[in-house]
Structures are given as C-alpha cells and as structure tokens.
A protein has these predicted regions:
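N-terminal secretory signal peptides that target proteins for export/translocation
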Residues: 1-12
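Intrinsically disordered, low-complexity and often Lys/Arg-enriched segments
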Residues: 2-4, 30-33
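Bacterial N-terminal signal peptides
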Residues: 13-26
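Structured extracytoplasmic
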Residues: 31-169, 176-181, 189-199, 206-213, ...
Length: 251
C-alpha cells in the first residue's frame, strides 16, 4: 500500500464533512418562465413563495433516475484522483438509493470520500428539515435581480441561523417564475476542520419537466498544510415520474 501523508488522510475526512451538504443544500423543483423583469417582491415574499413551491414540487415528485459521475482530485503531494459512476434513484416512499457502476483511481479517495458521500446523502435524505433552505434555518436579504439563460431570477444573500457544517452562507439565485433555486454560490457556515483554510461551492440546478433537480456541482477545498481538493459532480440526465398530473401552470 502506498504511503499517504497525514495531510492527505486529514483531507479525506475534512472533505467529507464539507461536502455533506452538497446534495442537501436544496431540493428545489418548479415550472416555466419568461424573459421579463421579475415582479418587485420583498425578500420575505420571495422566500415564502419559494418554500410553498418547493413543498408542492416535493410532494408531487414520485421517482427519478439518473446516471451520475463523481470525480475528486487532490492537487498536492502526492497528487491523487478518483472517480465513480453511479446509478441514482429516488422514490418518494423509500428515499434515495445508489449503485456504483464503475470506479477508478485512488482507492483511498473512492472509499473515504466518494463512497462516504453517497452514504451521507442517503442518510441525510431522511431528515431534511434541519438542512432545508427555509426561514427556520436561514435569514435572507434581497441583493437584486439577474437573468440566467434568459430566465429572470432574484439574487438573495443567505446567512445560517446557527453554525453548522451542513448549512452554508453565500448567495442563491431563485427563478422568478418557478420560485425554485437555480444556483448556489456559498461556503460552509462552519469550518469542518482546522486543517481546512477555505471551501468554495458552486451548485447549479436544471429544470426537468415540472421539477428542478441538481445539475452539476464543483467544490474546491484548500488545505492549510498545502494542496487543494476539487470535487465535481455531474448529475446526468433525469428520468422523472410525477406523483400526479402536473397542473398546466406548474406548481
């Protein structure tokens, strides 16, 4: 077995803690939009509509399937990399399940980071209230509006009410028609370890039928002793089954 410096072993543990929330950050789902400027709503109104639309979409999502690609690279000494391809299934009755189709690269990163990340996502899905993007967990401040690929969006600053490794602070982009989170740029609310100096997360969502689901993620973690870990997730193309016929106007 090759020798791994202590900083690499620490990195695998710390990266896992930092990345736990990536899939918890939001499960936001929605419907269509136009290119006009969004209505002049307050932050409280936007958050209220987002929470109600999110709940309606969650209640109406019965099942989805996708083929995901997880990759992690440690740029330091020694340089390490690993990837896994995963079949992901969600069922409203039983939650999430994963099946690893293929894996390659560093066994240390596969076992200690990528596989544990899947297990964390599976377990965390059982209790989403403590990590959900709601007024129970965060404060919100309206920062303006932007167009994202022709779709108007509200930009909000978010601050967690408590320090937690599974919550974050940063900005969210809320689709102005669907009131679904379209993008997140953030950092963990609490540094998971002294050995980590900074973590930056970029998370994007895609509209699939009437639902908004994770599309891609990039998380970069800098280690105090030197080196950088980069995790990327490509969530693939979704096959979605709604629980009921979607209303013409969406959820």
């Amino acid at each position: 077995m090759p020798f791994f410096p202590r900083k690499v072993l620490l990195l695998t543990e710390c990266s896992l803690a930092t990345l736990c929330f990536l899939v918890l950050a939001a499960m936001a789902w929605g419907q269509a939009a136009d290119k006009t400027s969004p209505a002049p709503l307050s932050a409280a109104q936007i958050v209220d509509l987002m929470q109600r639309h999110n709940q309606a979409r969650a209640d109406n999502l019965k099942h989805y399937h996708s083929l995901r690609l997880y990759e992690v690279q440690y740029k330091g000494f020694p340089a390490l990399a690993a990837k896994i391809t995963v079949e992901a299934d969600y069922d409203s009755a039983i939650g999430k399940s994963f099946r690893i189709v293929s894996q390659s690269g560093s066994k240390l990163l596969v076992d200690k980071v990528l596989k544990r990340l899947l297990e964390t996502e599976r377990e965390a899905g059982k209790d989403q209230k403590s990590t959900a993007l709601t007024s129970a967990n965060y404060t919100f401040r309206l920062d303006g509006t932007e167009n994202m690929a022709g779709r108007p969006a509200y930009v909000l600053d978010v601050e967690p009410l408590v320090k937690s490794k599974l919550l974050y602070r940063g900005k969210i982009w809320v689709d102005a028609h669907d009131f679904a989170v379209a993008k997140i740029e953030a950092q963990p609310a609490q540094n998971p370890s002294f050995w980590i100096s900074k973590t930056q997360i970029h998370h994007e969502y895609v509209k699939t039928d009437a639902f908004w689901l994770p599309q891609k993620n990039r998380s970069e973690t800098k280690v105090r002793l030197g080196g950088t870990a980069v995790l990327t997730i490509d969530y693939g193309t979704y096959q979605v089954v709604p629980a009921a016929v979607v209303p013409e106007g969406g959820f």
